[in-house]
């Protein structure tokens, strides 16, 4: 993937506005609530019986931070996102058996959380660059599946 200087700047600037400890848990909780079948990968997380339980679940919050922390690696390695996520892709495929479509669902939920949080600070032209970035990350995470 080729990134223009403007796209790189947009992603870096947007990332600087993201509070990992806030956005990560919200994005993962949204996935688990909106797409309840994704809960099967989190059987050890305890009570995921309803939206309030998911949003108040400390393990969901902690893993949401981990997920967003991993996303930061892509921000810092935009020229080699696939290489950056090679081992993580392999883990999710071979050990965790995660359906790769779930990465797209998480990206969509993350985008919704960002749009909600940033409001007017997340106009369509910034979302377009963000969507490209998320698509590259999803592709990289899905690489070991095919």
From Swiss-Prot:
It comes from Anguilla anguilla (European freshwater eel). The keyword Metal-binding applies. One of its GO terms (molecular function) is oxygen binding. InterPro entries: Globin, Globin-like_sf, Globin/Proto, Hemoglobin_b, Hemoglobin_oxygen_transport. GO terms for cellular component: blood microparticle; haptoglobin-hemoglobin complex; hemoglobin complex. Gene3D superfamilies: Globins (1.10.490.10). Belongs to the globin family. It holds the Pfam family Globin. Residues 2-146 form the Globin domain. Heme b binds at residues 63, 92. This is Hemoglobin cathodic subunit beta. This fish has two hemoglobins: cathodic and anodic. The cathodic Hb and anodic Hb display small and large Bohr effects respectively. In addition, the cathodic Hb displays a reverse Bohr effect and appreciable phosphate effects. Keywords: Heme, Iron, Metal-binding, Oxygen transport, Transport. One of its GO terms (biological process) is hydrogen peroxide catabolic process. Heterotetramer of two alpha chains and two beta chains. Involved in oxygen transport from gills to the various peripheral tissues. Red blood cells.
């Amino acid at each position: 993937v080729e990134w223009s200087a403007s796209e790189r700047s947009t992603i870096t600037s947007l990332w600087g506005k993201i509070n990992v400890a806030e956005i990560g848990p919200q994005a993962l909780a949204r996935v688990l609530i909106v797409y309840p079948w994704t809960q099967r990968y989190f059987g050890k997380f305890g009570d995921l019986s309803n939206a309030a339980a998911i949003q108040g679940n400390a393990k969901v919050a902690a893993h949401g931070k981990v997920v967003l922390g991993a996303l930061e690696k892509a921000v810092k390695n935009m020229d080699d996102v696939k290489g950056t996520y090679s081992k993580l892709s392999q883990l999710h495929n071979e050990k965790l058996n995660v359906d790769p479509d779930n990465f797209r669902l998480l990206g969509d939920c993350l985008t919704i959380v960002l749009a909600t949080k940033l409001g007017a600070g997340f106009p369509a032209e910034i979302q377009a660059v963000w969507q490209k970035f998320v698509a590259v990350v999803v592709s990289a995470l899905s690489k070991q599946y095919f």
